[in-house]
A protein has these predicted regions:
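Flexible loop and strand-edge segments within Gram-negative outer membrane beta-barrel domains
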Residues: 23, 199, 230-303, 330-347, ...
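Periplasmic N-terminal accessory/gating domains of Gram-negative outer-membrane beta-barrel systems
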Residues: 48-103, 107-140, 157
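Gram-negative outer-membrane beta-barrel transporters
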Residues: 483-486, 507-594
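Transmembrane beta-barrel wall of Gram-negative outer-membrane proteins
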Residues: 171-198, 208-243, 251-275, 312-320, ...
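Signature of Gram-negative outer-membrane beta-barrel scaffolds
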Residues: 326-421, 432-433, 548-551
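C-terminal beta-signal and adjacent terminal beta-strands/loops
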Residues: 575, 584-601, 616-620, 626-686
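Surface-exposed extracellular loop regions of Gram-negative outer-membrane beta-barrel proteins
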Residues: 283, 330-335, 378-390, 414, ...
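Outer membrane beta-barrel strand-and-loop segments of large Gram-negative receptors
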Residues: 303-309, 351-355, 450-456, 462, ...
Length: 686
């Protein structure tokens, strides 16, 4: 198989490169939650018992180079060890060999699906809305369920109870505003953000793209009420939508709408109760017009959840927490329309859990964070779809079924000295919402399927061990962790099948086993004019599914053998700061044809193995400079950036075609999204 690179961007997004089109940035000191970067951050990491947990320093992430001028939480955490982004054109992140769909992403208790805009260029997280963020990539704490890879727990920033704040940012492609402050002083506050792109305006300037639609918006809002000290009631809301289309040819639309209510109350100094109710609706939609026939694929994922938990402080060194949760899931796995024909498949499931967790320290040096989660998932009846007879699809056999699991989880820490410790952990987890993406398409869509009497719950067992240390002044800290994870009931499409093949997903997927193992290293500099870190991950992820690859183990599509990240921030003066990041990762596994042949005038390819080849490695350098001017009434900031500074064309899509120079040959063609992209934005903060 011969390869060549086509150094051009995809048709729509190449216009953005030509126009140097960039959206927004924001003042680092006030956007992602102000945190003073000192040695205390290293001490907090060292003190944590939980293995594989990252309490994200949002102020530091805000100073990293921004893609298209936009600070991005998800792209920033992709610089952490054991985490890597899905790549250009995809906005998810993958943790320790898991896929992006195996992560639980929550905002104030609201579950978010596919949290990205414009095929991953931006994430759903508006940087000036987020107040806190924690990533759990090791054994997940017992209070979380529904994820076998990681949990990203975030929360919207509360409005100030005493003073008003506001900011506005304008870039070439998007603008955003933020406002917060008291409604009732010392009792009730609000915080709201809004962001809207105007890519369409630039596309209208180019005649060949006037029929193209590309825009997104998102809004967040939060009310924070404190009736008395220690108690609070929070009401949160988020909504976002993407629209990408070429009129009369194709269209892709997706978005999240969610809301939550959280009530926390204290009873004395040792007892805390928390009640959270939330709702999410995620709705992707794809439409095409081919050969005079309109085709449409729509989905939705809706969940309603209620959680009650209680925390008991037994002593200064011992804490107990218990809780229960109930979640109702309703999924339209697919609704397909082919001209006048229509078929759909809707499923429902009910998941109930109870958990207990304990954190404690013994003999000053030994700490434990342990717990167990009991989970009962009930398969509920589905709505039979209207069959498209020409496809001869069998009617699925909907049968109620119950799945029960016991999921123990534990993390242990032993302090060798005050500056060095070792950790170990073990955890079981399960997932009943399956998202399966075709490896043959780069669209940001998955086919969703609930656990049924045919599709079994995904199960994961993870083991971890690590070492961490720091200098006495907190200037430097470092860590090393190793992990091994095994999975059961991992699903992939049958050979020759894609997400569009049939509505009944059970008939086009197969289940099997997976395993992932690796080593992670991290070194940080926390104090001084120059701060930053370097992280490296050596890992392997493999899958074995009967009926695929002759039942042999093969590299998973998200396997990355080597993953290296460097990030640095240099404070040049009180007004100027410089930052840069560089990433390198091994190429993505790829299924390539071994033989081609003609059948009735059509070229067909024969594939002997799944993911037997790899795309070229991915590497990129990003740079930025920020100038801030404090003022009497408001502060201003100019941000300048260069994405992909040495113009590396990383693979976005690789497909195969006949080699015109050799009729019997085949060549691989690579397409890339972005070359060198400059950015500029202006922010004003009251």
């Amino acid at each position: 198989v011969r390869t060549r690179s086509i150094i051009t961007a995809a048709s729509i997004l190449s216009t953005l490169n030509v126009l140097s089109a960039e959206p927004t940035d924001t003042i680092a000191a006030g956007s992602l939650g102000e945190v003073t970067v000192t040695g205390s951050a290293a001490r907090q990491r060292l003190a944590s018992t939980q293995i594989g947990a990252e309490q994200l320093e949002l102020s530091r992430l805000a100073r990293l180079p921004a893609m298209f001028g936009e600070n991005d939480l998800i792209r920033s955490i992709s610089l952490m060890p054991g985490v890597h982004g899905e790549g250009d054109g995809a906005g998810g992140f993958e943790v320790r060999g898991g896929t992006s769909s195996q992560n639980l992403v929550r905002l104030d208790g609201i579950t978010l699906y596919n949290p990205s805009h414009v095929m991953g260029i931006f994430s759903t997280f508006n940087d000036n809305a987020v107040g806190r963020a924690t990533l759990y990539k090791g054994p997940i704490p017992s209070e979380y369920g529904g994820a076998t890879a990681s949990v990203l727990e975030t929360s919207l920033a509360n409005g100030d109870l005493e003073k008003y704040d506001a900011s506005a940012t304008i870039g070439i492609l998007a603008a955003k505003v933020m406002a917060s402050g008291p409604v009732v002083k010392d009792r009730l506050s609000f915080a709201a953000t809004a962001r809207r792109s105007y890519v369409d305006a630039f596309l209208q300037m180019v005649p060949q793209y006037r029929s193209t639609v590309m825009n997104f918006y998102d809004v967040t809002a939060k009310l924070h009420y404190t009736p008395r000290r220690g108690d609070h009631l929070d009401v949160s809301f988020i909504a976002g939508r993407d629209n990408m289309a070429i009129k009369r040819v194709m269209g892709m639309y997706w978005g999240n709408v969610g809301a939550s209510v959280d009530w926390l109350t204290r009873r004395g100094e040792r007892l805390v109760f928390a009640t959270t109710g939330s709702f999410t609706n995620y709705s992707p939609d794809m439409r095409m017009s081919m050969a005079g026939t309109d085709q449409k694929l729509t989905e939705y994922v809706r969940n309603f959840s209620l959680t009650e938990k209680v925390g008991i402080t037994l002593s200064d060194s011992h804490r107990l927490e218990a809780g229960l949760s109930s979640e109702l899931l309703r999924v339209k796995s697919a609704e397909m329309e082919y001209g006048d024909h229509r078929e759909l498949d809707i499923r429902s499931g009910w998941e109930n859990s109870v958990w207990v967790a304990y954190d404690g320290t013994f003999a000053e040096r030994f700490s434990v964070a342990s717990g167990v989660r009991l989970n009962l998932y009930s398969v509920m009846s589905g709505r039979p779809f209207r069959k498209f007879e020409a496809m001869a699809e069998p009617t699925p056999d909907y049968r109620p079924e119950n799945y029960f699991s016991v999921e123990p989880r534990i993390s242990l820490k032993y302090d060798i000295t005050q500056l060095h410790n070792i950790k170990a952990g073990f955890g079981l987890s399960s997932q009943n919402l399956h998202a399966i993406r075709s490896s043959s398409t780069s669209f940001p869509f998955d086919r969703y399927a609930l656990t049924s009497n045919v599709v079994k719950p995904e199960r994961a067992v993870q083991y971890g061990i690590g070492y961490a240390g720091m200098t006495a002044d907190g200037m430097f800290d470092w860590s090393a962790e190793g992990y091994y994870k095994s999975l059961r009931n991992v699903y992939d499409y049958q050979d020759g099948r894609t997400m569009f093949s049939q509505v009944n997903i059970e008939s086009i997927i197969l289940g099997g086993r997976g395993r992932s193992y690796g080593l992670e290293f991290m070194f940080r500099k926390n104090v001084g004019r120059l701060t930053g870190w370097i992280s490296y991950t050596l890992s392997r992820t493999r899958t074995r599914i009967p009926g695929i690859n002759d039942g042999r183990w093969y590299d998973a599509s998200n396997d990355r053998r080597h993953d290296l990240s460097l990030a640095a921030v240099f404070r040049l003066s009180d007004r100027w700061s410089l930052s840069g990041s560089w990433i390198f990762s091994s190429g993505q596994p790829l299924t390539a044809p071994d033989v081609k042949y003609e059948l009735d005038g059509t070229t067909c390819y024969y594939y002997s193995q799944r993911n037997g080849y790899r795309t070229p490695p991915v590497h990129r350098l990003d740079l930025s400079a920020t100038w801030t001017r404090p003022g009497r009434h408001f502060d201003t900031q100019w941000s300048f950036g260069i994405y992909n500074a040495y113009c590396r064309y990383n693979p976005y899509i690789v497909y195969f075609e006949d080699d015109p120079s050799k009729p019997s040959g085949t060549r691989a063609v690579q397409q890339s999204l972005f070359g060198l992209v400059p950015s500029i934005s202006y922010t004003i903060k009251l």
